[in-house]
C-alpha cells in the first residue's frame, strides 16, 4: 500500500506570510519567499502570488482555466470514502468500494437505480477529480478526526496532480451536536466534540442569559473542523419554528426570532473566524433556509411533495418571525445562504410586506428560483453579497 498523502506533506514557511503546503506540486522559491505553482507556469504569476488579493488571483485564474475546469466548479455531489467507511445508502444498493493505493479513496464507479436521489451513476474518485474536475463534494460519513484528515489530504493530493491546481472543497452538515443520525439532516454525530442539539443550546442560552455559550460552541467547531481540513458546513438552520409538527424542528434554535438572531450574531463570526468573511483559519457557513423554513403547511417538509408550500398564516409574519436571523447572516457576511425547497402560497397566506412596506408578490416558484425573494428581497433590499 502506498504511503498516505498525510505522511508526504512538505511545508514551507514564508516570513510574515502563509505556510505553503504540498505533496508533489512544485514550489517556487524567489527572493526568499515560497509560492505554490498553482497554474503550472513555474513562475510567480498573478495566480501563484499570494501577496495579491484573492479577488485579483481569482480574476487571473479564470482566464487560465479551461471550460471543463470552470464547469466543474458549478456542481456539488455527495461523495464517498474508501472501504473502511462504506456508505450505508450505497451498500444497500449493492455498491462495493474498491480502495485506491492509499486505501482511503473509493475507485469503484457507482451505479445504483434505487436511492433517495433516484438513479445514480458516479465515476471513480480519481475520474471525478481529474476528468470531471468536480471540486465541491458533500461528505456524510462519520470517520475519526485522524481518518477524516487523511481522507481530505488524499483528495487534495489528487487535485495537485491536475494541470491546474484547484483544491477540493469538502462540505458537511453539522457534526457537533448530539442526536440521531438522519441522512441529509444529521449525518454525523459522536466523533467531534459533542454539544446538546441546537434546541438544547438555545434553551441554555435563553435560560442562563449567557450568549458566551454560543461563542464557545462556535470556536470549538471552527478549531476542530479546520484542524481536519473540513472547511465548509451546510449549517446552521436560521429557521424560526412556527409549526411544532415540522420534522426539522430538531435542527433549529427554536421559536424566538430575537434569540435566534442574537445566536447567529455570535455563531457566524465564531465559526468563520470574523465578521468580514471567512478567515484562513475559519470554516465557511451556509446559513439555511431562506426566507425561513418554519412556515410549514401542516408541518410537512418540502423534501417531499406534501410539504411544498410555505404558508404565512398572519399578516407580516414573514418579517416578524422568519427573516430576522438572516439579517444576522448578512451583517456577518455568511459565505452562502441556502434557499428552502418550498414555494410561497398566495392563496393560503395572509398579506406580507417587504422592507419598503410594499406588498410581496407570493409567486408560486421554488425559493431558489424565485426572483422576488432572491434578487428582490435577499440581494436587493437586504444586501446579501455571497452566493445562494
Spans of features found by a protein language model:
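Glycoside hydrolase catalytic-domain context in secreted enzymes
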Residues: 1-388
Amino acid at each position: 500500500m502506498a504511503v498516505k498523502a498525510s505522511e508526504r506533506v512538505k511545508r514551507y514557511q514564508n516570513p510574515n506570510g502563509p505556510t505553503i503546503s504540498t505533496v508533489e506540486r512544485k514550489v517556487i522559491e524567489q527572493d526568499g519567499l515560497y509560492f505554490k505553482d498553482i497554474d503550472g507556469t513555474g513562475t510567480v504569476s498573478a495566480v501563484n502570488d499570494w501577496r495579491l488579493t484573492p479577488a485579483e488571483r481569482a480574476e487571473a485564474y479564470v482566464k487560465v482555466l479551461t471550460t471543463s475546469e470552470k464547469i466543474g466548479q458549478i456542481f456539488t455531489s455527495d461523495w464517498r470514502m474508501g472501504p473502511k467507511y462504506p456508505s450505508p445508502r450505497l451498500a444497500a444498493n449493492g455498491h462495493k468500494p474498491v480502495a485506491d493505493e492509499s486505501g482511503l479513496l473509493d475507485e469503484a464507479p457507482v451505479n445504483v437505480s434505487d436511492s433517495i436521489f433516484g438513479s445514480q451513476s458516479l465515476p471513480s474518485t480519481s475520474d471525478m477529480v481529474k476528468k470531471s474536475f468536480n471540486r465541491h463534494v458533500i461528505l456524510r460519513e462519520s470517520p475519526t478526526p485522524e481518518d477524516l484528515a487523511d481522507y481530505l489530504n488524499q483528495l487534495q493530493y489528487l487535485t495537485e496532480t491536475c494541470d491546474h491546481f484547484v483544491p477540493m472543497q469538502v462540505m458537511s452538515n453539522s457534526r457537533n451536536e448530539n442526536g440521531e443520525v438522519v441522512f441529509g439532516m444529521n449525518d454525523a454525530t459522536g466523533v467531534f466534540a459533542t454539544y446538546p442539539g441546537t434546541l438544547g443550546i438555545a434553551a441554555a442560552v435563553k435560560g442562563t442569559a449567557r450568549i458566551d455559550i454560543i461563542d464557545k460552541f462556535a470556536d470549538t467547531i471552527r478549531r476542530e473542523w479546520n484542524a481536519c481540513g473540513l472547511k465548509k458546513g451546510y449549517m446552521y438552520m436560521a429557521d424560526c419554528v412556527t409549526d411544532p409538527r415540522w420534522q426539522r424542528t430538531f435542527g433549529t434554535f427554536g421559536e424566538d426570532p430575537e434569540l435566534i438572531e442574537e445566536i447567529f450574531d455570535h455563531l457566524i463570526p465564531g465559526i468563520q473566524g470574523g465578521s468580514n468573511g471567512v478567515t484562513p483559519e475559519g470554516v465557511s457557513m451556509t446559513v439555511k433556509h431562506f426566507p425561513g423554513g418554519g412556515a410549514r403547511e401542516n408541518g410537512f417538509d418540502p423534501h417531499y411533495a406534501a410539504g411544498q408550500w410555505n404558508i404565512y398564516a398572519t399578516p407580516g409574519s414573514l418579517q416578524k418571525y422568519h427573516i430576522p436571523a438572516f439579517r444576522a447572516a448578512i451583517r456577518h457576511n455568511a459565505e452562502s445562504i441556502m434557499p428552502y425547497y418550498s414555494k410561497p402560497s398566495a392563496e393560503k397566506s395572509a398579506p406580507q410586506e417587504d422592507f419598503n412596506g410594499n406588498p410581496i408578490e407570493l409567486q408560486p416558484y421554488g425559493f431558489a428560483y424565485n426572483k422576488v425573494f432572491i434578487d428582490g428581497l435577499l440581494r436587493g433590499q437586504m444586501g446579501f453579497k455571497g452566493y445562494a
